[in-house]
Amino acid sequence: MLKCFEPSVLGRELDREPFKFSHQLLGHPALDLDNLAKVIPALPSEYVKYSKGLMRNGDDFENCDVQHRSQMSLAETIESMRTSDSYVMVRSPQIHESFQSVFRDLSGDVEQLLRKTLGHRQRLLINPRLYLFIASPGSHTPFNIDRNSTMLLQFRGSKQLVLFPQWEPRVVAHEAREAYAAFDGTKLPWSEARESFGQRFDFAPGEGLHIPFIAGHYVQNHEDDVSISMSIIFNTPESQAQLEALQLNHKLRGMGMAPAPVGQRAGRDQLKSFLWRARRKVRHTLRLPPDN
Protein backbone atom coordinates (compact mmCIF):
# COMPACT_ATOMS: atom_id res chain seq x y z
CA MET A 1 0.00 0.00 0.00
CA LEU A 2 1.36 3.39 -1.01
CA LYS A 3 1.73 6.01 1.73
CA CYS A 4 2.72 9.08 -0.31
CA PHE A 5 1.59 8.63 -3.93
CA GLU A 6 -1.92 8.07 -5.27
CA PRO A 7 -2.44 4.46 -6.42
CA SER A 8 -2.70 5.43 -10.12
CA VAL A 9 1.08 5.91 -10.18
CA LEU A 10 1.56 2.14 -9.92
CA GLY A 11 0.72 1.74 -13.59
CA ARG A 12 3.63 3.90 -14.76
CA GLU A 13 7.16 2.81 -15.59
CA LEU A 14 9.98 4.98 -14.31
CA ASP A 15 12.62 6.49 -16.61
CA ARG A 16 10.68 5.75 -19.81
CA GLU A 17 8.74 9.00 -20.03
CA PRO A 18 7.72 11.87 -17.74
CA PHE A 19 4.33 11.76 -16.05
CA LYS A 20 2.32 13.76 -13.56
CA PHE A 21 0.83 12.22 -10.44
CA SER A 22 -0.90 13.20 -7.21
CA HIS A 23 0.65 12.90 -3.77
CA GLN A 24 -0.84 12.62 -0.29
CA LEU A 25 1.65 14.67 1.73
CA LEU A 26 -0.01 18.08 1.75
CA GLY A 27 -0.08 19.41 5.29
CA HIS A 28 2.91 17.35 6.41
CA PRO A 29 4.43 19.33 9.31
CA ALA A 30 7.98 18.94 8.01
CA LEU A 31 7.13 21.04 4.94
CA ASP A 32 5.55 23.93 6.85
CA LEU A 33 7.48 27.15 6.23
CA ASP A 34 7.77 27.83 9.97
CA ASN A 35 9.38 24.42 10.50
CA LEU A 36 11.69 24.97 7.54
CA ALA A 37 12.78 28.32 8.97
CA LYS A 38 13.93 26.45 12.09
CA VAL A 39 15.34 23.30 10.52
CA ILE A 40 17.31 24.62 7.54
CA PRO A 41 19.61 27.05 9.41
CA ALA A 42 20.38 24.25 11.89
CA LEU A 43 21.67 21.90 9.16
CA PRO A 44 25.39 21.69 8.35
CA SER A 45 26.25 24.48 5.92
CA GLU A 46 27.48 22.09 3.24
CA TYR A 47 23.93 20.74 2.90
CA VAL A 48 22.40 24.13 2.03
CA LYS A 49 22.84 26.37 -1.00
CA TYR A 50 21.09 29.69 -1.33
CA SER A 51 21.34 32.54 -3.78
CA LYS A 52 19.80 35.90 -4.62
CA GLY A 53 18.90 37.35 -7.98
CA LEU A 54 16.90 35.94 -10.84
CA MET A 55 18.73 33.24 -12.79
CA ARG A 56 18.29 32.33 -16.44
CA ASN A 57 18.94 29.40 -18.75
CA GLY A 58 22.65 29.10 -19.46
CA ASP A 59 23.65 29.87 -15.85
CA ASP A 60 25.64 27.21 -13.99
CA PHE A 61 22.91 25.95 -11.66
CA GLU A 62 25.20 23.76 -9.56
CA ASN A 63 27.32 26.81 -8.67
CA CYS A 64 24.54 29.37 -8.34
CA ASP A 65 25.37 29.98 -4.68
CA VAL A 66 28.78 31.30 -5.79
CA GLN A 67 27.73 33.19 -8.90
CA HIS A 68 24.59 34.71 -7.34
CA ARG A 69 25.78 35.01 -3.76
CA SER A 70 23.27 36.53 -1.35
CA GLN A 71 24.30 39.25 1.09
CA MET A 72 21.62 38.12 3.53
CA SER A 73 21.93 35.36 6.08
CA LEU A 74 20.14 32.09 5.43
CA ALA A 75 17.52 32.90 8.09
CA GLU A 76 16.91 36.35 6.56
CA THR A 77 16.64 34.80 3.12
CA ILE A 78 13.91 32.39 4.23
CA GLU A 79 12.02 35.08 6.15
CA SER A 80 11.99 37.44 3.15
CA MET A 81 11.42 34.77 0.51
CA ARG A 82 8.24 36.38 -0.82
CA THR A 83 10.03 39.57 -1.87
CA SER A 84 13.76 38.85 -2.11
CA ASP A 85 14.11 37.00 -5.47
CA SER A 86 15.88 34.20 -3.63
CA TYR A 87 16.37 30.48 -3.97
CA VAL A 88 17.21 27.87 -1.32
CA MET A 89 18.20 24.28 -2.07
CA VAL A 90 18.72 21.73 0.70
CA ARG A 91 20.50 18.45 0.06
CA SER A 92 19.45 15.43 2.15
CA PRO A 93 17.15 17.14 4.67
CA GLN A 94 16.37 13.62 5.92
CA ILE A 95 19.38 13.96 8.21
CA HIS A 96 17.03 16.03 10.41
CA GLU A 97 14.56 14.05 12.50
CA SER A 98 11.51 15.96 11.21
CA PHE A 99 12.13 14.60 7.69
CA GLN A 100 13.06 11.02 8.56
CA SER A 101 9.56 9.53 8.49
CA VAL A 102 8.60 11.14 5.18
CA PHE A 103 11.89 9.95 3.69
CA ARG A 104 11.17 6.37 4.78
CA ASP A 105 7.66 6.52 3.34
CA LEU A 106 8.75 8.02 0.02
CA SER A 107 11.57 5.49 -0.32
CA GLY A 108 9.10 2.69 0.34
CA ASP A 109 6.68 3.98 -2.29
CA VAL A 110 9.39 4.31 -4.95
CA GLU A 111 10.61 0.80 -4.19
CA GLN A 112 7.07 -0.48 -4.70
CA LEU A 113 6.97 1.21 -8.12
CA LEU A 114 10.25 -0.41 -9.07
CA ARG A 115 9.17 -3.86 -7.89
CA LYS A 116 6.02 -3.52 -9.99
CA THR A 117 8.09 -3.34 -13.19
CA LEU A 118 11.44 -4.94 -12.26
CA GLY A 119 10.36 -7.72 -9.90
CA HIS A 120 11.80 -8.61 -6.51
CA ARG A 121 15.46 -8.04 -7.27
CA GLN A 122 17.98 -6.80 -4.73
CA ARG A 123 19.13 -3.18 -4.72
CA LEU A 124 16.34 -1.82 -6.88
CA LEU A 125 16.49 1.54 -5.11
CA ILE A 126 20.05 2.89 -5.16
CA ASN A 127 21.17 5.81 -3.00
CA PRO A 128 17.80 7.51 -2.41
CA ARG A 129 17.80 10.95 -0.82
CA LEU A 130 15.68 14.06 -0.57
CA TYR A 131 16.16 17.51 -2.02
CA LEU A 132 14.18 20.49 -0.79
CA PHE A 133 13.58 23.67 -2.80
CA ILE A 134 12.21 27.02 -1.62
CA ALA A 135 11.94 29.83 -4.17
CA SER A 136 10.55 33.34 -4.41
CA PRO A 137 7.53 34.05 -6.63
CA GLY A 138 8.56 34.36 -10.26
CA SER A 139 11.99 32.79 -9.74
CA HIS A 140 13.62 30.69 -12.43
CA THR A 141 15.67 27.50 -12.10
CA PRO A 142 18.11 27.35 -15.04
CA PHE A 143 18.27 24.49 -17.50
CA ASN A 144 20.06 21.55 -15.89
CA ILE A 145 20.19 17.77 -15.86
CA ASP A 146 20.25 15.34 -12.94
CA ARG A 147 22.43 12.27 -12.47
CA ASN A 148 19.43 10.54 -10.92
CA SER A 149 15.79 9.72 -11.46
CA THR A 150 13.42 12.15 -9.72
CA MET A 151 9.95 12.26 -8.23
CA LEU A 152 9.23 15.98 -7.65
CA LEU A 153 6.39 16.93 -5.28
CA GLN A 154 4.81 20.39 -4.96
CA PHE A 155 3.67 21.66 -1.53
CA ARG A 156 3.13 25.41 -1.88
CA GLY A 157 2.87 27.78 -4.84
CA SER A 158 2.67 26.68 -8.45
CA LYS A 159 5.19 26.35 -11.25
CA GLN A 160 5.82 25.24 -14.78
CA LEU A 161 8.55 22.73 -15.55
CA VAL A 162 9.80 22.36 -19.11
CA LEU A 163 11.23 18.89 -19.69
CA PHE A 164 13.35 17.65 -22.58
CA PRO A 165 14.03 14.17 -24.06
CA GLN A 166 16.69 12.23 -22.16
CA TRP A 167 19.11 11.39 -24.94
CA GLU A 168 18.42 14.04 -27.59
CA PRO A 169 21.86 15.38 -28.70
CA ARG A 170 20.32 18.56 -30.12
CA VAL A 171 19.32 19.47 -26.55
CA VAL A 172 22.46 18.28 -24.75
CA ALA A 173 25.39 17.09 -26.85
CA HIS A 174 26.78 13.67 -25.97
CA GLU A 175 30.08 15.22 -24.84
CA ALA A 176 28.33 17.73 -22.55
CA ARG A 177 26.08 15.06 -21.02
CA GLU A 178 29.07 12.82 -20.32
CA ALA A 179 31.07 15.67 -18.76
CA TYR A 180 28.11 16.59 -16.56
CA ALA A 181 27.72 12.98 -15.42
CA ALA A 182 31.42 13.00 -14.50
CA PHE A 183 31.10 16.27 -12.53
CA ASP A 184 33.43 17.91 -15.03
CA GLY A 185 31.65 20.86 -16.62
CA THR A 186 28.25 21.66 -15.11
CA LYS A 187 27.47 24.81 -17.12
CA LEU A 188 25.26 23.55 -19.92
CA PRO A 189 25.02 25.54 -23.17
CA TRP A 190 21.60 26.98 -23.91
CA SER A 191 19.88 28.50 -26.95
CA GLU A 192 16.26 29.24 -27.75
CA ALA A 193 16.42 26.65 -30.55
CA ARG A 194 16.20 23.96 -27.87
CA GLU A 195 12.74 25.14 -26.77
CA SER A 196 11.02 23.24 -29.58
CA PHE A 197 12.00 19.95 -27.93
CA GLY A 198 10.47 20.85 -24.55
CA GLN A 199 7.32 19.42 -22.98
CA ARG A 200 5.57 21.78 -20.52
CA PHE A 201 4.04 20.65 -17.24
CA ASP A 202 2.09 22.96 -14.93
CA PHE A 203 1.61 21.71 -11.42
CA ALA A 204 0.30 22.94 -8.10
CA PRO A 205 0.24 21.79 -4.45
CA GLY A 206 -0.67 18.14 -4.19
CA GLU A 207 0.74 17.34 -7.61
CA GLY A 208 4.05 15.86 -8.65
CA LEU A 209 6.11 15.05 -11.71
CA HIS A 210 8.43 12.18 -12.59
CA ILE A 211 11.62 13.43 -14.26
CA PRO A 212 13.42 10.56 -16.00
CA PHE A 213 17.12 9.98 -15.44
CA ILE A 214 19.42 12.58 -17.10
CA ALA A 215 16.46 14.43 -18.73
CA GLY A 216 17.16 18.15 -19.10
CA HIS A 217 14.68 20.59 -17.58
CA TYR A 218 14.14 24.11 -16.29
CA VAL A 219 11.53 25.58 -13.94
CA GLN A 220 9.57 28.83 -13.90
CA ASN A 221 7.77 29.54 -10.64
CA HIS A 222 4.49 31.39 -10.96
CA GLU A 223 3.91 34.75 -9.28
CA ASP A 224 1.15 33.56 -6.92
CA ASP A 225 3.21 32.52 -3.89
CA VAL A 226 6.49 31.25 -2.50
CA SER A 227 7.19 27.83 -3.98
CA ILE A 228 8.01 24.89 -1.73
CA SER A 229 8.78 21.58 -3.40
CA MET A 230 10.64 18.44 -2.48
CA SER A 231 12.01 15.62 -4.56
CA ILE A 232 13.20 12.14 -3.84
CA ILE A 233 16.06 11.30 -6.16
CA PHE A 234 17.50 7.84 -6.69
CA ASN A 235 19.09 5.50 -9.18
CA THR A 236 17.87 2.17 -10.46
CA PRO A 237 20.14 -0.65 -11.65
CA GLU A 238 19.62 0.57 -15.21
CA SER A 239 20.23 4.27 -14.55
CA GLN A 240 23.26 3.48 -12.37
CA ALA A 241 24.76 1.51 -15.25
CA GLN A 242 24.00 4.37 -17.64
CA LEU A 243 25.61 6.88 -15.28
CA GLU A 244 28.79 4.80 -15.06
CA ALA A 245 28.78 4.32 -18.84
CA LEU A 246 28.56 8.10 -19.29
CA GLN A 247 31.51 8.56 -16.94
CA LEU A 248 33.55 5.98 -18.86
CA ASN A 249 32.71 7.70 -22.15
CA HIS A 250 33.94 11.00 -20.72
CA LYS A 251 37.24 9.40 -19.75
CA LEU A 252 37.60 7.80 -23.20
CA ARG A 253 36.95 11.11 -24.97
CA GLY A 254 39.71 12.65 -22.89
CA MET A 255 42.01 9.99 -24.35
CA GLY A 256 41.09 11.01 -27.90
CA MET A 257 38.56 8.25 -28.53
CA ALA A 258 34.98 8.57 -29.86
CA PRO A 259 32.85 6.09 -27.87
CA ALA A 260 29.33 5.12 -28.90
CA PRO A 261 26.65 7.18 -27.11
CA VAL A 262 24.94 5.89 -23.98
CA GLY A 263 21.21 5.19 -23.95
CA GLN A 264 20.97 3.32 -27.25
CA ARG A 265 21.86 -0.28 -26.34
CA ALA A 266 21.38 -1.61 -22.81
CA GLY A 267 23.92 -4.42 -23.18
CA ARG A 268 26.64 -2.03 -24.30
CA ASP A 269 25.86 0.32 -21.42
CA GLN A 270 26.08 -2.58 -18.96
CA LEU A 271 29.49 -3.58 -20.33
CA LYS A 272 30.78 -0.02 -20.02
CA SER A 273 29.45 0.11 -16.46
CA PHE A 274 31.30 -3.12 -15.62
CA LEU A 275 34.54 -1.75 -17.09
CA TRP A 276 34.18 1.54 -15.20
CA ARG A 277 33.60 -0.22 -11.87
CA ALA A 278 36.52 -2.57 -12.54
CA ARG A 279 38.75 0.42 -13.23
CA ARG A 280 37.69 2.06 -9.96
CA LYS A 281 38.35 -1.17 -8.05
CA VAL A 282 41.86 -1.47 -9.50
CA ARG A 283 42.64 2.15 -8.65
CA HIS A 284 41.38 1.59 -5.11
CA THR A 285 43.46 -1.60 -4.75
CA LEU A 286 46.57 0.25 -5.95
CA ARG A 287 45.73 3.16 -3.62
CA LEU A 288 45.62 5.57 -6.52
CA PRO A 289 43.63 8.78 -6.03
CA PRO A 290 40.03 8.65 -7.31
CA ASP A 291 39.31 10.50 -10.51
CA ASN A 292 36.49 11.05 -12.95
Where are the predicted features?
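Ligand-binding loop in jelly-roll beta-barrel domains
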Residues: 204, 215-230
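A short beta-loop-beta micro-motif enriched in histidine and acidic residues
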Residues: 127, 140, 144-150, 196-197
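Conserved short histidine dyad/triad with adjacent acidic residue
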Residues: 131-145, 164-168
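Transition-metal
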Residues: 1-108, 247-255, 277-292
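Double-stranded beta-helix
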Residues: 154-210, 215
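A gly/proline- and charged-residue-enriched helix-loop-helix capping module
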Residues: 96-132
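Conserved double-stranded beta-helix
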Residues: 200-202, 236-292
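A short hydrophobic beta-strand segment most commonly corresponding to one strand
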Residues: 174, 224-240
